[in-house]
Structures are given as structure tokens and as C-alpha cells.
Amino acid sequence: MNKQSLFHIAKRGTLPWYISAAIRGCAILFALIVCALVTMFMTGENPISIYGTIFHGAFGTVRKTWVTFQNLAVLLGISLAVTPAFKMRFWNIGAEGQVLIACLATAACMICLGDKLPNGLLILIMIVAAIAAGALWGFLPAFFKARWNTNETLFTLMMNYIATQLAAYYIIVWEVPKGAGKIGIINQNTNAGWLPQIAGKQYLLTILVVAVLTVLTYIYLKYSKHGYEIAVVGESQRTASYAGIKVERVIIRTMVLSGAMCGLMGLLLTAGTDHTLTTTIVGGRGFTAVMVSWMAKFNPIMMIFTSLLLVVLSRGASEISSVFGLNHSFADILTGIILFFIIGSEFFINYKVSLRKAGKKEA
């Protein structure tokens, strides 16, 4: 006898957006319930207090709220940068390095030219240098992929290590004071190369730039000819070639764009908010951006919400550790559970699971 499984799984058609949103909402609700149970069993703490602390850690004060939105803007900006490549099915895991190399280029301009040029001209040079550095870091793996079909995942990953070691080298070259192993605040006395504050807020410029970038990326991917070519290449390179699209050119152009956008985020990090350079200045957001982009299905508008979710969880994790005296890993456990449910909900959006009816037995 041939035994049939109890469940039948079939591919769904495209669901209306409100049904997809409802499935994701249910996934988050179930995740919070599971997190509450885990919290009670592992710590004995009231889960409501834990969730309240997470919210307070992200929005408890005006300053915390500004920091949350600044972190949201940086993560969203990097996520937007990797999205064109991902939509093309080019697995760019190198955003961390592309942002970091732009931070290095920005810091180099601030340190070497800070006392030699007017501030307006210096900032203009910094913008060009940061975008060019990020674009170069995106161009190299794209060129090798287009010409020799190299593995872009490994290539972009290795470029991260090169960027990290370059940054580490120049941090020692520029360290202040000598032997400190760090640069410190660049041009702290003169503020040369510091991007201007808006309404007295150093975070507001980053937020505004990323807001504009979100709209432009959405229009570019959805309504431009380049966006159409990216979508076609992502579906099938062979089909794209038959349609007269030059696949190699699209690959290189798209990765240069992704790298340039990462470069802009590197400029905003170094010259806009941190005013320094460290090997960890990007803080792993280049890798988190991969998750943000995938969870949002490469939709720049949806990325606002996925970025906000991850930033709130991250900010809340730090607050939990300090308020309850819990190991920071516990907050990571809660974050992992929530992300597991959210990612798992995509299965139920794309597939229908039903009980198989009892049929005739087959010999």
C-alpha cells in the first residue's frame, strides 16, 4: 500500500495585501504569547513588565525616541541599498564592508583636509569620496560576477574583511594620542567636515535623507526602466537576454548603485552622527539589512516597519538587561522567537496547508 501524508501542501496564488498583513499580525501575536510563556518559566518575571520595558527602552524619553529613529534611519538606509541587488537575485552580503569603506573615505577627508579647505568644499569632497568608495566596493564583485560568474556571496563577504582590515590599519595610523588604538572624535575643536545639524538635532539630517531615499528607491524599482530590467533579470537572466536586456550591464550598474547608497550611509554615520571611525561603527547593520529587505519582500515602504520592529527589539534588549539585571542573551532569545514567527508566517502566505481527505486505498 502507498501511504499518503495527512497534510496536503499547495502553492497559493497572490493573496490580497490585507490577508497577508493579517497572517503576519497573527504571527507576531503568537510570538508575543510564546515569549510571555518563556519569560515566566525562565525568569519568573512578569512578561507584561518585560514588554513595557522594551517599549520604554525605545521611546521612554525624548532622547531615546530620537536615538531610536536615528537607528531606524541608518538600518533602513542600508536595507534600501541592498534591495536593488537582492531583487536582481544578486546576493550582496557586503553592505557592511561597503558602508565601512565609505566611513573610512569620509574620515580620511576629515582628517587630511579638515584644516586645509573651507567647510562647504570639504563636505562636498567627502560626499563624492564616500559615494565613490562604496560604489567601488560594489563594482568589484559585480564585475567579476558579470565577466566570470564568480560566487557573489563569497566575494562580497570577503570584501567585508578587506574593508575591516583597511579601517583597522588607518585607525592605528591616525590614532590620537599615539598608542591609544583609537581615533577619538575627529576635528572636535573645529567641527570641520561635520554635517550641519537641523533644528539643533544631529539625527534629523540622517532621518530626512533616508526618508527621501525611501521614496526615490520605491519609484526607481517600481516605475523606472532600470527597475523593470532589475525585476526581469531577477526572474530569469535567460529571459532578460531574449528580451534584449544586457544582463552584464544591469548587474554592474545595479551593484554600483547599491554600493553608492551604502557609501551615502557611511558618510551620514561618520560625518553626521558619530564623528569618528572604528571597525565596528556599522554595528552589524549590513547583515541585519539582509533580513529587513527579505522580510519586506523588497518593498521599500514595508521596510520602514520591519526596520522599526528590529530597532525597537534591539533598543529594548539593552533596557531589559539594565532594569531586570538579566543577561543580554535573554533579550536576544526573545528577539529570535519573534523573528522566527515572522519569517515562518511567510510559509503560510505562500502555501496552503490542508488535511488530506481519506481516499481509496491503492494496492
Ranges and model annotations:
Residues V256-C262, G266-G336:
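Transmembrane alpha-helical segments in multi-pass inner-membrane proteins
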Residues E152-Y223, F330, K361-A363:
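Transmembrane helix-bundle core of multi-pass membrane transporters
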Residues E152-L154, Y203-V209, I251, G284-R285, ...:
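Loop-to-transmembrane alpha-helix initiation sites
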Residues A199-T276, P300-I301:
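Helix-loop-helix "hairpin" substructures at the membrane interface of multi-pass membrane proteins
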Residues L37-T43, S49, A58-L113, I127, ...:
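Single transmembrane alpha-helix segments in multi-pass membrane proteins
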Residues G44-S49, F86-L104, A146-F155, E229, ...:
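Short, non-helical or kinked segments that cap or interrupt transmembrane helices
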Residues M1-F30, A36, F41, E235, ...:
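Cytosolic-side transmembrane-helix boundaries in multi-pass membrane proteins
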Residues R24-M40, L76-V82, C103-C109, A130-L136, ...:
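Hydrophobic core segments of alpha-helical transmembrane domains in multi-pass membrane transport
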